[in-house]
Swiss-Prot record:
<comment type="function">
    <text>Metalloaminopeptidase that catalyzes the removal of a penultimate prolyl residue from the N-termini of peptides, such as Arg-Pro-Pro. Contributes to the degradation of bradykinin.</text>
</comment>
<keyword id="KW-0031">Aminopeptidase</keyword>
<keyword id="KW-0464">Manganese</keyword>
<dbReference type="InterPro" id="IPR050422">
    <property type="entry name" value="X-Pro_aminopeptidase_P"/>
</dbReference>
<dbReference type="InterPro" id="IPR029149">
    <property type="entry name" value="Creatin/AminoP/Spt16_N"/>
</dbReference>
<comment type="similarity">
    <text>Belongs to the peptidase M24B family.</text>
</comment>
<feature type="binding site">
    <location>
        <position position="489"/>
    </location>
    <ligand>
        <name>a peptide</name>
    </ligand>
</feature>
<dbReference type="Pfam" id="PF01321">
    <property type="entry name" value="Creatinase_N"/>
</dbReference>
<dbReference type="GO" id="GO:0070006">
    <property type="term" value="F:metalloaminopeptidase activity"/>
</dbReference>
<dbReference type="Pfam" id="PF00557">
    <property type="entry name" value="Peptidase_M24"/>
</dbReference>
<dbReference type="InterPro" id="IPR000994">
    <property type="entry name" value="Pept_M24"/>
</dbReference>
<dbReference type="InterPro" id="IPR033740">
    <property type="entry name" value="Pept_M24B"/>
</dbReference>
<feature type="binding site">
    <location>
        <position position="77"/>
    </location>
    <ligand>
        <name>a peptide</name>
    </ligand>
</feature>
<feature type="binding site">
    <location>
        <position position="523"/>
    </location>
    <ligand>
        <name>a peptide</name>
    </ligand>
</feature>
<keyword id="KW-0645">Protease</keyword>
<keyword id="KW-0007">Acetylation</keyword>
<dbReference type="InterPro" id="IPR001131">
    <property type="entry name" value="Peptidase_M24B_aminopep-P_CS"/>
</dbReference>
């Protein structure tokens, strides 16, 4: 993985920072966040500005360029990847480590007095802007909006913004019509005297209107904004895709609807001008709702006295709690996904000993088996197919230069998922096709114990996900080990594979309490640099728990695994498990047999069925 040579790009960018045609006044630093104008985690090629400038293409990271320095902040998932992809012009800032300065503190330490720090106001989230501006201002510096993105100025072959056809989803998939969703949203707006609600997150717009797209690879979303009023709906979207007969019928565009459900379609780039026009007509007490994750440009288009910011929008919270149709769809999707993976692992067991399977060919085979399943649309993220030392790169994606051959001597980790019309999947399994070492088994067993501890947890209603994070780490901590990523994230229903507002992470952030119907992942891991990676990941559904007592009548919750793929018992030090942990695994494997075995039979996949039965034999400790 040769690093990208960035000297000339940095020279051009620094020149733009001083050029009066690009900035009103020279700036001494320029910030390049990861996201797009919608603060998306996964972005279209035209928005990969940070990757273009630095070579680092992980999904999380912020680049800051000054006249003399170029620094990159990223989290523990990407330390190894960033170090390999960036050349020596760059300094890697490892977020979460005690000696790593924050972006603000670093800027204060390196900037000359009275410096101006620039950033594209359409890309930077409002909450980030406020935090950065406050620290810089206190040190005598200024954070300033640069309306023409400077990276775009030097990116001569920047791709066009995608504008692909839309897909409509019926009630069998969504459970609720878009009109009902708008009505529910308006009730929440009325409760707080909100007259307009600005929707900027792409997955929230897709969910609200029961539409899907493919403008961003692996994420079924489309570039758009929406403004919902108490009596008006405005959808900002480009291209003629809204005129497709199925879409027009779905959105009722040709019907003489009552005005409150009539959708006004406007150009995508007119969002700021239209928002300013709406705000000009507000009476003194009227408020406009917007997420504090929305761009600073959108937030600033709303006068401060009328602006009502929130960390999570009502759409974000409603989307996270799956209704019965969405939950049923997610179950169907995970059954199909398990069938594909049983086929894959059976194939790998046969082919790896022959010596011809690589990380890339294994990932391709996983996609091939998934494509055979009904309603398959796309992968849900690039497959992480990694063997041996590549497994220690947490978000590794194989490329020809790094592509290793799977062998009988190394641990193999595959983290993969799919988008089906009825749901989104995300599953990780770690396997050995030969004989694992005692240390590999020991580490795998610690990870498994953590996985079981979360999955089997019973906790009071109202518990936030970060309180469960230590459950996953306890066995690792006992031996002085740990992992540098969160334990779980929310999962969309045929939407983004990562979604808020819930999750399981050691980071203290304003996550919403877990409630029945939410879907998250359970994915502890352990990574030995230069040797191997281990992760066990299931998607789980939050469900009510049956308990002996009910303190203060508050109720309890637990998790139901939706992922039903065998966990390789060869990798387990069974005697290190408790009886309760053995019982959990045996029960889980029995469910795999009952549910996935039946589907494999229905689809006539006999060899994969035989593999499933072999891999789900009960285990027991030697007493």
């Amino acid at each position: 993985m040769a690093p990208k040579v960035t000297s000339e790009l940095l020279r051009q960018l620094r020149q733009a920072m001083r050029n009066s045609e690009c900035v009103a006044e020279p700036i001494q630093a320029y910030i390049i966040p990861s996201g797009d104008a919608h603060q998306s985690e996964y972005i279209a090629p035209c928005d990969c500005r940070r990757a273009f400038v630095s070579g680092f293409d992980g999904s999380a990271g912020t680049a800051i360029i000054t006249e003399e320095h170029a620094a990159m902040w990223t989290d523990g998932r990407y330390f190894l990847q960033a170090a390999k992809q960036m050349d020596n012009n760059w300094t890697l800032m490892k977020m979460g480590l005690k000696d790593t300065p924050t972006q603000e503190d670093w800027l204060v330490s390196v900037l000359p007095e009275g410096s101006r720090v620039g950033v594209d106001p359409l890309i930077i989230p409002t909450d980030y802007w406020k935090k950065m501006a406050k620290v810089l201002r206190s040190a005598g510096h200024h954070l300033v909006p640069v309306k023409e993105n400077l990276v775009d100025k030097i990116w001569t072959d920047r791709p066009e913004r995608p504008c692909k056809p839309l897909l409509t989803l019926g009630l069998d998939y969504t459970g609720i019509s878009w009109k009902e969703k708008v009505a529910d949203l308006r009730l929440k707006m009325a409760e707080r005297s909100i007259v307009w609600f600005v929707v900027t997150a792409l997955d929230e717009i897709a969910w609200l209107f029961n539409l899907r797209g493919s403008d961003v690879e692996h994420n079924p979303v489309f570039f758009s904004y929406a403004i919902i009023g108490l009596e008006r709906i405005m959808l900002f979207i480009d291209g003629d895709r809204i005129d497709a007969p199925g879409v027009k019928q779905h959105l009722l565009l040709d019907l003489g609807l009552e005005a409150e459900y009539k959708i006004q379609v406007l150009p995508y780039k007119s969002i700021l001008s239209e928002l300013k026009t709406l705000c000009a007509d507000l009476s003194p007490r009227e408020k406009v709702w917007v997420s504090d994750k929305a761009s600073y440009a959108v937030s600033e288009a709303i006068p401060k006295d009328h602006r009502c910011c929130m960390p999570y929008t009502p759409i974000c919270i409603a989307k996270a709690v799956k209704n019965s149709a969405e939950s049923a769809g997610m179950r169907r999707a995970h059954i199909k996904d398990a069938v594909a993976l049983c086929e894959l692992f059976n194939w790998l067991e046969q082919e790896v000993p022959k010596g011809g399977v690589t990380e890339i060919s294994a990932a391709d085979k996983a996609e091939e088996f998934r494509r055979q399943q009904a309603d398959f649309v796309d992968l849900s993220f690039p497959t992480i197919s990694s063997t041996g030392p590549n497994g220690a790169i947490i978000h590794y994606a194989p490329i020809p230069e790094t592509n290793r051959t799977l062998s009988l001597d190394e641990v193999y980790l595959i983290d993969s998922g799919a988008q089906y019309k009825d749901g989104t999947t995300d599953v990780t399994r770690t396997m050995h096709f030969g004989t694992p070492t005692a240390y590999e088994k020991e580490c795998f067993t610690y990870v498994l114990k953590g996985h079981i501890a979360v999955s089997a947890a019973v906790f009071p209603t109202g518990t936030k996900g970060h309180l469960l994070d230590s459950f996953a780490r306890s066995a690792l901590w006992d031996s002085g080990l740990d992992y540098l990523h969160g334990t779980g994230h929310g999962v969309g229903s045929f939407l983004n594979v990562h979604e808020g507002p819930c999750g399981i992470s050691y980071k203290t952030f304003s996550d919403e309490p877990l409630e029945a119907g939410m879907i998250v992942t359970d994915e502890p891991g352990y990574y030995e640099d230069g040797a191997f990676g281990i992760r066990i990941e299931n998607v789980v559904l939050v469900v009510p728990a049956k308990t002996k007592y009910n303190f203060n009548n508050r109720g309890s919750l637990t998790f139901e695994p939706l992922t039903l793929v065998p966990i390789q018992t060869k990798m387990i030090d069974v005697d290190a498990l408790t009886d309760k942990e053995c019982d959990w695994l045996n029960s889980y494997h029995q469910t795999c047999r009952d549910v996935i075995g039946k589907e494999l039979q229905t689809q006539g996949r006999q060899e994969a069925l035989e593999w499933l039965l072999r891999e789900t034999e009960p285990i027991s400790r030697q007493h």
